[in-house]
Amino acid sequence: MLNGENVDSRIMGKVATRASSKGVKSTLGTRGALENISNVARNNLQAGAKKELVKAKRGMTKSKATSSLQSVMGLNVEPMEKAKPQSPEPMDMSEINSALEAFSQNLLEGVEDIDKNDFDNPQLCSEFVNDIYQYMRKLEREFKVRTDYMTIQEITERMRSILIDWLVQVHLRFHLLQETLFLTIQILDRYLEVQPVSKNKLQLVGVTSMLIAAKYEEMYPPEIGDFVYITDNAYTKAQIRSMECNILRRLDFSLGKPLCIHFLRRNSKAGGVDGQKHTMAKYLMELTLPEYAFVPYDPSEIAAAALCLSSKILEPDMEWGTTLVHYSAYSEDHLMPIVQKMALVLKNAPTAKFQAVRKKYSSAKFMNVSTISALTSSTVMDLADQMC
C-alpha cells in the first residue's frame, strides 16, 4: 500500500512540471475550504501566452436536435432559395355572417333572449344552454317509465303513495336538496318498472333509492346507519347495501335522468316570475309525486304545467306567451290536460290523507304557499271541475 505523503508529492510534482512546460508559474499553497479549487494561478499567464490564445472568430450554428454549437467553416453547403410566404386568401365572411344572422333571427323572432346578459358568467354556459336543454329532453324520453308497470307488481298505487309521503318526511328530516327528492322518486319508479317488489321490501327499496340519490346529488349524504335508524331498524346495513347493488345493476348504473326542478328553473327564468310563483310551482310538482297518474308525463311537461298553473293562481292575467312556449317547448293547449289534473290534486289537498307535502310548504321557509287563499279561487275550482 502506497504512503499517502508519497502520493501527494508525486501528484504535486507532476502539476508543477506541466505548469512550467506551459510557461505558467506554479504557486501551489494552502487554500481554505470551498474556495478556489484550482492548483494553477490563472492570473499569472505570460503576455506572450495571452496573445497566442487570440484566435479568429468562427461562424457558429446549432447542431441538429441539440442545443450544442458546431463550427460550419469548411462545409460545402448549397445555398437554398428562400420560400416566399404565401398570404392566405381572404375568407368570404358574408355568407357565414348572413347564415348566423338568419339563424339568430329565426331563433329569437318574437322571443326574448333570456341568456343575453349571462355571457360574463361561465357557470351559466350561456353559449350552450339551449343545446344542453335539448339534450335533456332527449334523455327524459330515453328514460321514460311505462304507464302500466303496476300490473307486474304485488304492491298497489296506494302503497306507492304511502311510501312517497313518508319519503318526503325523511327528505325534510335529513335537510336534503330538492334534486335528491325528485331523483329518489325517479329511481323508485324506474326500479319498480323492471323488478317486481314484495310488500315487505317496498320500504327498503324506498330508503335505498334515497341513499343512491343522496350519493348522486349531495356533498355530504346521510350514512347507511342513518337510514337504518329512520326505518326503526326494520332493515340492516347489509340489506340496504345489497339492495343498493341490486338497484344500480337493474338500472344499468344510469342515474342521469333530468328532473322537474331542472326544467322549472329554466321556465321560471323565461317567464321572469317572482319567488312566490316559483315556490308555488315547486309545491305543485311535489303534490304530483305520490300520484301514480302523473308517472307517464315527462319531467319537462310537469314543470311547465306547474308553472302555468302557478301563474294562473297568483296572476290570472299572465299569459303563456311566445317566450315561455319557446323555452318550455310546450304550448298552453298541450299543457292544459296536465294543468287540470294538477288543479284537481290541489283542490283535494286539504282533505287528502297524505299531508307531508302540504305541511312542508306551510312553513315560512317556503313562503307558506300551501295555505294562501288563492288556492281556493274560482280559477282552481273551474280547472279542477273540468276533470270531474
From Swiss-Prot:
Coiled-coil annotation reads none
Leader sequence range is: none
Q: Name one Pfam family in it.
A: Cyclin_C
Give the highest taxon in the source lineage. Eukaryota
- Asked whether the UniProt record includes Cell division among its keywords, one would answer yes
InterPro entries xref list: Cyclin, Cyclin-like_dom, Cyclin-like_sf, Cyclin_A/B-like, Cyclin_C-dom, Cyclin_N, Cyclins_cyclin-box
The UniProt entry's GO biological process terms, in alphabetical order, are:
cell division; mitotic cell cycle phase transition
Q: Tell me the keywords, alphabetical order.
A: Cell cycle, Cell division, Cyclin, Mitosis
Family as reported in the entry's similarity comment? Belongs to the cyclin family. Cyclin AB subfamily.
Q: How does it assemble?
A: Interacts with the CDK1 protein kinase to form a serine/threonine kinase holoenzyme complex also known as maturation promoting factor (MPF). The cyclin subunit imparts substrate specificity to the complex.
Record function comment: Essential for the control of the cell cycle at the G2/M (mitosis) transition.
Q: What is this protein called?
A: G2/mitotic-specific cyclin-B
Q: State the organism named in the record.
A: Marthasterias glacialis
